[in-house]
Amino acid sequence: MAPPQSQKQRSRNGCLPCRKRRKKCDEQLPQVLGLYLSLSEQLEPVPVDLSPAEANDNSSSSDSCDSILPAHLAVTGPHHSGIWPSAERAHSTYYGAQGLALLESVASHSHRSLPSIDKHIGAEEFARWDYARIYGPTVTWIPYNTGLSNDFDPDDAMPLIKQSIALLGDTKEPVFVEVENFYLAFFARYYYDYASITDLIIYRARERFATSDCLKQGMLSTAVLFRANYENSGLTAPLRDHARELHSLAVKTLQVDLDNHTVSPWVKLSGVMELVNHDYYAGNLATYYHHLSQAASLVKMVLHSNNIDLLNLAGEHTFDIRLFAWCDIMGGMALSRPTLANYESDIPDPSVHRMVGEHHAHPDKGVEWIFGCPDVLAVLLARTTGLRHASVSSEEKATRGKEIERLVRESQFGLVRAKTSIMRAARLAAQELWRHAAILYLHHAIFKSERNHSGVQDSVKQIIKIAGTLKVGVNPDCFLSVPYFIAGFFATSPKHRHTLRSRVLSCGNERFLRHLAQALDELWNESDANGGLTSWAGNHPPKFIF
């Protein structure tokens, strides 16, 4: 039998005197509780009504979210110890550290002085809260927290990196320690199958670092940029400034190398691709595509051809060519333009050729170990782009497109390698996400299908369903922004759109993810207003990177 309710217990819907008088309670919620309810409603992000100009300003300002917390809201008070430990334990959040700091400061000020809270928290502060939620950091990366080691190092590979650093001994370049620390902290965010190169990465990184000043400055700029994006410390703004300085220095050094005929084209290509890599993570749209075009001419120079056989291109020395190939394929998709190189590979018929044995992603072959997309799908994506811009009839395009779709659906991928069954399942899921993204790209580029097409909606739902099995913001989820974006482009229901937009943002803290989310908002508004499907490309200058 339940114990009688205490007469001193506060009612859920009213104060005690109101309950005794059996009258409807008109008691007002305390301001602190009302504030918390208002903030808690934003746990599931909803679109913020920003004008296009305001949204563009927000996404293009790299440092604006570093000053979200108003100066008069100091983080003090009795609630300090209650909120931050949970924030530090959470590896992924929609708020980010800055937003949580604002919430904590609100709580502490409310506790000290309820009557004055409205003076401190007004429309401007709530607007900043919305900005923090949409454009601020979404992933809190704490690699040194042993309680979350499975998230930061699911393949338990970091001890091997530490061992290789110890075996190689001190480097002649003391500043290389910054790069070593970068790999120790962010390796699982930087390479998809990072365990496949654990025993080689430090040795190869040292060689690359010592090759040229441009490579040295480019590698350091990326290492510092990752710290600025993920550490969520008071050093965020200085780190970002330092990353910009290193990048600017690398750009100047690269120009000197490009003008120097004694520098090997291979070294020049490595320098350009290091800057392409930095531009990608920094969200530098104009310089990203400019450097990619520079790399295209260098690739043609070192290969003596404009054709790349991605499935058979192998060797440590081909790393920058393979990196270029992936960026070029993604650039063709994002901009709806032909690729800068031609991708010709023989793809065995899946109905005849069955994969036998273990064919894991290999660090000296293909791009799957870097980005997570199976190599055969990367070639088929390039083939789709080539067909899109081919001078053939619509009927011929449709016929060839159906053959590409058959290969996409029937292709067998290499076996995944992972230490745990959970991680193996996650990487199998990632392969299937790329498969459905390739199908949707065919519908967009070749078949010109509408959103309500049954095949389109089936792939959208499959991507949402499979994504629901992956932990947000960590490997392999952090490599899947392109499948999420493509599925979001075709999504019709508000629920599906919200889910996929959130998945894009939750992949990480990089600015290019904010660009993708903003592009989805604009595409949805445009298609809803026009009543039909629009293209995601065609903007000059470009608005996002794949």
For every predicted segment, state its role.
Residues 2-267, 281-483, 487-546:
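Intrinsically disordered, low-complexity activation-like regions
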Residues 275:
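Aromatic-lined, polymer-binding surfaces characteristic
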